[in-house]
Amino acid sequence: MTDKLKFKTSLLNKVPPPPPKSNQPSPSTSTPASPNVNSTNNSPSVSPATTSPIPSPGMSPLLTPENNNNNTNIPHQTSLLNNSISNKSSVSFLNNSGGNTINKSSPLSQSSSNIKNGGPIRTSTTLAQFSGSSLPNTENSSPPPSSSLISSSSSPTAESLLYSEDSIASGGTVTVDPNTKNGNIYNGNGLRNNSADILPHNNHTYCVGDDGFYLFGGTLPDGSYTNDFYTFQFAIKAWTILTFGSAPSIRTRHTGVLYNNSMYIFGGYSPSGPKNDIYVFSFDTQTWSEVQTEGTKPSPRYGHTAVVESGHMIVFGGISCDQTTKQQTVNNDIFSLNLDTKQWSQVLSTCPPSPRTHHTATMHKGNMYVFGGQDQQSNQVEDIVHCYTWASNSWKSIQFEGSSMTPRSDHSAVLFQDSIFISGGSSKSQTSQNLEIYEYDLYQKKCFKISSSTIVQNRISHSSVVKGNSILFWGGCTDNSFDYFSFGKDEFEEDYQDDYESNRVQNIPKELWEASLMKKHPEILELREKTLAFTGSKSFAKTLATPSFSENRLALSHQFVLQLIMEYLERNTYHKVIAAIQKESGVLHQPTESGESRLVSLLRLVKPRLRNKNVFDTDLSLFSKEEGNDPEVAVVDHLYHDYRHFDEEEDINVWEEGEDNNRNIRKVETDNNKVQIKAATFNKLIHYLAPKEKAFDPNFLKVFLYTHSSFTTSEKLLKKLIQRYQVPNSNANEPKYKSEVVEPVRQRVVDVLKYWVDKCPWDFNAGPTSSVLVATLNNFIDGSLTRDGNSNIKKLRELKKKLQHEDVRPYSEPPPEPKVPKNIFSPQLTLAHIDELEIARQMTLVESKLFGAIPPPEFMVRVIGYGEFQYNMATSPNLMTFVNRATDVSRWIVHTVLNESRDKKNKMKMLDKFIKTTECLRQLNNFQTLHSVLQGLQHPLLLSRPDLFTPRHREIIADHEMLFSKIDNYKLYREALARSQPACVPWIDIIREDFAQIERDQPSNMNNLINFTKRQNLYEILSKIGHYQFPYNLQIVHQVATFVNKLPKYSEYDLNLLSESLQSQVNSPLAGVYQPSLIGTTGSSSSINLGSARELNNSNRDSNNITGSSSNNNSNSSNSLSPIVKL
């Protein structure tokens, strides 16, 4: 690292050697020699290119609709390459929709052939440049002194780039070109780790993150379109294909922008024509989702550009298609999408540039710079640079001095500090097959041509990204490797190592930064210890070594904690997890000498100290008052922060909040002329929750109380309401002030409390702080309300008592008569004796009760460390219980069918019973259990026995699969759910997905204000859930409910073990003799043995790890759900 810094310092003070003379051969041999191309290729041909639905570089952008679906007889890439080299007077064009490849020329096609190293010509693209994506920026906006020897561009200073007069005077004979800069272009041999895993792409979109380079879609060498999603990891120098959820459809010539750690894909061309849909990929949740937008959306288009500025995606130009006349039009319009509100709008600006496509647009400090492109007649536009200013909504043309870049299209542009680098592309005037690079210095308004002693082949419709002090080029040619450009020597390998080390350090928690530094650099620790007398700081080594309350000889060591964990796992027979812990930690599990559990021993030790304490109290102090907090802990952990509350505003009294202004509230007027709150501070929301005015919005009250847990806690809300009730005194007219301010505000506060206790009781009767909340409410009722003689005291106390009783909503009519078997009271009652409808009813009662017990706060996604969205048992216990039952039902179905008597006929009967049960579940609108049973019926262990399924069975399963199909965002399921009666059990996966989409696409805060629009969207889902939680009018049959109430918990390992045992019985010499099942039950498994799961656990289990999440290492199925559900 030190050598690297020394080199970069010397680079600015040394003059590089003169470049080789023009008659000398190039020293670079890394790139293959370009084939000789007949000079006739430079003359345009009049043959129209009518076979390609997407024009190749230089071809007309107009499409021929009748050829869009020609998808046969695609020649192999090798044959195209050979054909292109052997027939040098013509060029082979690929039909991008998959059609035939023929040798025809278009007006600009023949000059384009000079750019390729043989092989197929790539179609053009429009590459969106990303502003703010880890690109360096300078704060100093003042232009530098005008001098040919001083440059404020992204490259190093002119002394290290240009040949100065001093070098000439010292004997140099080189003629200085002030419009040329010298750099180095390298062929990325060191970056080809697994380049064979990815085909060359063009017309794709890309973005750069801290850890890698991401690309999506584009055109493949055979001319077909793709929706591949790849990442190139800088640290390991390897390509990886990403397959997350429902990716956008295949497309090319689309655009992509990076915003809020998400990649937005817009438009493009697909086999069905141009598109104007928009998808987003969240790098936090690693999922795709389609973005639903409002407003004036751009027409379907491709070949456009998109950039981001001030939270808006700005779309310019491109080719659109009239859906009626199929007429193709090149545009110069501008559309803006607010990425926070998802609102489209057309921007009407003055003096826009001529219509164009295949151009580039780059954003720099509020200005969008547009370079090159093609017009309606496929002619490359002038080389004038157009600049659009977002703040003033105006266009202007900029003339750059210095070198002149030839008009071109299908090039790439990238921002590097304060310069834009243009590379490659198709140009009429270009006769070389080498990659050309131009630098546009935005401060000096000067264009420099980049000269290099090494050459690489030209690229068209490629990517160019900044990494460190280099610019990487990928795609747009027959090779799938990287080339990269740098003003210094080839230090790319070292840069990657530094980046990897930087990312590793950034992943260390802040509280461990100091300890990690001391461990990695003992010389710093030694220096710190020697200077303690001067600095006065506490000894770091002493802090970590001296016994104290936090770390002492009696404290629990990590070995002891591991023993505690393994004791728990041993009691639950998780032997495989214990073996993994022992292997990883080197700590062997050993029983205590006394035979008593270590946990029991610990409880005996702490019992005298905790005497009258409840160990489950959330406010239990770790230390007694006389001990206090260990001061040494503060020294070590002074960098620690509680990230869960980093967005909390300062606790200001609600009455000290100022009047409405842009800093504390944002409003919007609705279609019916009503003012709606878009975002506000917490105090300002309390103002509108209990306003002084008589006008009161009941919908605002519902949204606030149902969703308040997403931006505050119930304790803080109650504290703010009490603050609002305590109206400060005023020196104004006392009677008028009391009647117009004091009494209305207090009445509104009491009304809010009544609605909260009555309609949202979950905050008071569930959760770790519910007792504190109830105690605070009691104090308020017995204190302020009683003292003021409020008339609502009685009503509030009645509602508070109601919290202790379950709210039962009876039906006016009796439930339907249950279908009980004749031997209902027989000890030999099995599942085979029970009617399918009654099985479905009892399962529905269980699922409905579990679903009805989920309070709304548990549905809202919780954000834990590193921005990952998760549900877990700590924050959503009822929801997780409901989700985990889906896994239990699916595996119970599989186990019950497999463990049926070895007679194939009985297995088919049991399978038939479950399939008929699915039809009954569908009639009962129990979609959750229906999906769980369907997952069990589609388990690989059952699908491996196709002889058990009849054609009728397959037909019923196919109908259910269609119901849960992802087509049109689960359209069939959503329509079926809308037609359901109030009593239904929805499919929980769709509810979680709807919540997750809102969390991904809508920020929680807007300019330090609570995004209340997001809470309104959350409430729309929560209000529907409330209707679904209506109980069923069904009667419990206890004998039947025994079979489906508490299902045994089987793991994938258990199911595989059962399958293997059954297979071994079939192959054994005693196959004709009845043998008991290895699972612990005998005879038919329809007679459910609820203890069989515990007996089964004597085998090594892999379904749960220490944290309780399912790993299913031995499973080939993807149908299982984890107790921690990642969205």
UniProtKB/Swiss-Prot annotation:
Name of one Pfam family that matches: RasGEF
Gene Ontology biological process terms from the UniProt entry: macropinocytosis; Ras protein signal transduction
Stretch list, region Disordered: 1-82, 96-154, 1090-1127
CC terms in the record's Gene Ontology section: macropinosome; plasma membrane
Composition skew (Polar residues), residue ranges: 122-132
Kelch repeat ranges, renumbered to this chain: 212-261, 262-311, 313-366, 367-418, 420-469
Factors inducing expression: Down-regulated by Pseudomonas aeruginosa, PAO1 strain and PA14 strain infection and by phagocytic stimuli.
Assigned keywords, A-Z: Guanine-nucleotide releasing factor, Kelch repeat, Repeat
Keyword S-adenosyl-L-methionine carried by entry: no
GO molecular function: guanyl-nucleotide exchange factor activity
Domain LisH: 557-589
Compositional bias annotation for Low complexity: 23-53, 67-82, 133-154, 1103-1127
Residues in Ras-GEF domain copies: 835-1062
Gene3D superfamilies named among the record's database cross-references: Kelch-type beta propeller (2.120.10.80), Ras guanine-nucleotide exchange factors catalytic domain (1.10.840.10), Son of sevenless (SoS) protein Chain: S domain 1 (1.20.870.10)
N-terminal Ras-GEF domain sequence ranges: 673-804
Function of the molecule: Promotes the exchange of Ras-bound GDP by GTP.
Full protein name: Ras guanine nucleotide exchange factor F
Species whose genome carries this gene: Dictyostelium discoideum
